[in-house]
C-alpha cells in the first residue's frame, strides 16, 4: 500500500508542477527561472507545514504522510531543474542573476520551511477548537 501512496502522490506532484510551471512561464517569460523558484519555495513551505502538523497535531498514518511528502512534494519540487537553470544562467554569462537565483533559492527554501513549521504550530482559535470538539462529539 505504501507504494500506491507514493505513486499517487508522485503523479499528483509531477502533474501539478508541470501545469503550475507552464502557467507561471506564460506570465513571466523573463530570464529569471521564476516558476521553479516559486514551486520549490512553495514545496518547502508545504513540507514544513505538513510534516510538523501531521507529526504534532494530526493523527495520520506514516504511509499517507510519506505519500504527501516524499511522493507529492518530492515530485512537485525539483532540485535537478534548479541545477539546470542555474547552469544555463552561468553559461549564458548571467552570473549576477545566477548568484541571485542560488541565494534566493537556498535562503528562501530555509525561510519557507521554517515558516511552514511556524504556521503548523500556531494555536487553534477557540472557535475552531470548539468546532472540532463539537464534530467529534457528534453534536452538530
Curated annotation (Swiss-Prot):
Disulfide bonds: none
Regulation: Na(+) is not transported, but it plays an essential structural role and its presence is essential for fluoride channel function.
Principal place of residence: membrane
Annotated compartments: Cell membrane
Reaction catalysed by this enzyme: fluoride(in) = fluoride(out)
PANTHER family: FLUORIDE EXPORT PROTEIN 1-RELATED (PTHR28259:SF1)
Family to which this protein belongs: Belongs to the fluoride channel Fluc/FEX (TC 1.A.43) family.
Function summary: Fluoride-specific ion channel. Important for reducing fluoride concentration in the cell, thus reducing its toxicity.
The protein, known as: Fluoride-specific ion channel FluC 1
Organism: Moorella thermoacetica (strain ATCC 39073 / JCM 9320)
Source organism phylogeny: Bacteria, Bacillati, Bacillota, Clostridia, Moorellales
Amino acid at each position: 500500500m505504501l507504494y500506491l501512496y507514493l505513486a499517487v502522490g508522485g503523479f499528483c506532484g509531477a502533474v501539478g508542477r508541470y501545469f503550475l510551471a507552464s502557467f507561471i512561464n506564460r506570465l513571466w517569460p523573463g530570464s529569471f527561472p521564476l516558476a521553479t523558484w516559486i514551486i520549490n519555495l512553495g514545496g518547502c513551505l508545504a513540507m514544513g507545514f505538513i510534516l510538523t502538523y501531521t507529526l504534532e497535531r494530526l493523527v495520520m498514518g506514516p504511509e499517507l504522510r510519506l505519500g504527501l511528502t516524499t511522493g507529492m512534494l518530492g515530485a512537485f519540487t525539483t532540485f535537478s531543474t534548479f541545477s539546470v537553470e542555474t547552469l544555463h544562467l552561468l553559461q549564458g554569462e548571467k552570473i549576477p542573476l545566477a548568484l541571485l537565483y542560488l541565494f534566493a533559492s537556498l535562503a528562501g527554501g530555509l525561510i519557507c520551511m521554517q515558516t511552514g513549521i511556524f504556521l503548523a504550530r500556531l494555536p487553534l482559535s477557540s472557535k475552531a477548537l470548539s468546532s472540532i470538539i463539537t464534530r467529534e462529539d457528534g453534536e452538530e
